[in-house]
C-alpha cells in the first residue's frame, strides 16, 4: 500500500514539475497563470488532500487514471460523483473562489479525459469489445442513508457535461425515486432524447430492497452506486 501511495505522489509531482517548466517558457500571461495553478494543484494532490473544487477534480482524475494504469481496468466506476465532490464545490462557490461556469468547465474536462482511458485486450476481446468503452459508471441523484433526497447542483451539472461532451464515457446513470425533484427528471430526459443512450435510470424503490435481501444494511443499500454496466453495490464494499 505504501509503495502504491508513494507512486501516486511521484506521478503527480512529475506533472507539477512539467507544468512549472511550461509556465516558465510561456509568453501568454493567461496561459502562464493557468499552468502555475496546475503546478500548484499537482503539488498538493493527492499527497496533501484537496482543499477546493479545482484540486478535488485534479485528485479525482489522478486516482481514476492510476487505477486504470494499475489494472488495465475494467468497470472502474467513479460512483456518486455529485455527492463526494459537492462539499468542495459548495465551499468554493460560497466563498467566491469559483463560478458555476468554471466548475462546469472543469467537469467537462474530466468527462473528456475519461474517454482517454483504454484497456489492453487480447485479439479476440478487442474484436468483441471494439471501441473505448470501459464502463466507468458515474451516478447522480438519489437519496442518502437517512432517506433524504440529495440531488444537488452537481447532479444537474453531470448531465450537462454529458450534453456538452457527447462521448460514451462516463457511463452516466441517475438514481430516481418518489423523492426525486421533477426538474431533475425532466433534465435527465432531455439528455435521453438526444439519442446518445444516456443516462441509465435506476429505481431506488426497487434496488434498495433488493440489496437488503442480499445482506446489505438499509443504510448501505440507500448509498448504492452502479458498477460497470448495471451492477448495484455499496461504494467501497465491493469485496
Which stretches of residues belong to each language-model region?
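Conserved catalytic cores of very large enzyme subunits
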Residues: 1, 30, 34-37, 41-239
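Charged, low-complexity interaction regions
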Residues: 25-29
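Mature extracytoplasmic enzyme cores
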Residues: 1-24, 35
Amino acid at each position: 500500500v505504501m509503495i502504491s501511495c508513494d507512486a501516486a505522489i511521484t506521478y503527480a509531482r512529475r506533472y507539477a514539475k512539467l507544468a512549472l517548466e511550461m509556465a516558465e517558457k510561456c509568453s501568454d500571461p493567461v496561459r502562464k497563470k493557468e499552468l502555475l495553478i496546475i503546478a500548484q494543484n499537482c503539488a498538493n494532490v493527492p499527497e496533501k488532500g484537496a482543499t477546493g473544487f479545482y484540486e478535488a477534480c485534479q485528485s479525482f482524475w489522478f486516482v481514476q487514471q492510476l487505477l486504470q494504469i494499475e489494472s488495465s481496468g475494467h468497470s472502474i466506476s467513479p460512483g456518486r460523483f455529485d455527492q463526494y465532490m459537492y462539499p468542495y464545490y459548495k465551499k468554493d462557490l460560497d466563498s467566491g473562489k469559483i463560478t458555476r461556469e468554471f466548475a462546469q468547465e472543469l467537469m467537462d474536462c474530466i468527462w473528456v479525459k475519461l474517454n482517454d482511458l483504454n484497456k489492453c485486450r487480447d485479439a479476440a476481446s478487442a474484436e468483441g469489445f471494439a471501441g473505448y468503452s470501459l464502463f466507468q459508471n458515474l451516478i447522480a441523484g438519489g437519496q442518502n442513508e437517512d432517506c433524504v433526497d440529495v440531488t444537488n447542483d452537481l447532479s444537474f451539472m453531470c448531465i450537462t457535461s454529458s450534453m456538452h461532451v457527447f462521448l460514451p464515457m462516463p457511463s452516466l446513470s441517475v438514481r430516481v425515486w418518489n423523492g426525486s425533484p421533477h426538474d431533475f427528471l425532466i433534465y435527465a430526459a432531455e439528455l435521453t432524447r438526444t439519442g446518445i443512450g444516456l443516462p441509465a435510470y435506476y429505481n431506488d424503490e426497487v434496488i434498495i430492497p433488493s440489496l437488503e435481501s442480499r445482506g446489505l444494511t438499509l443504510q448501505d443499500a440507500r448509498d448504492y452506486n452502479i458498477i460497470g454496466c448495471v451492477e448495484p453495490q455499496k461504494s467501497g464494499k465491493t469485496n
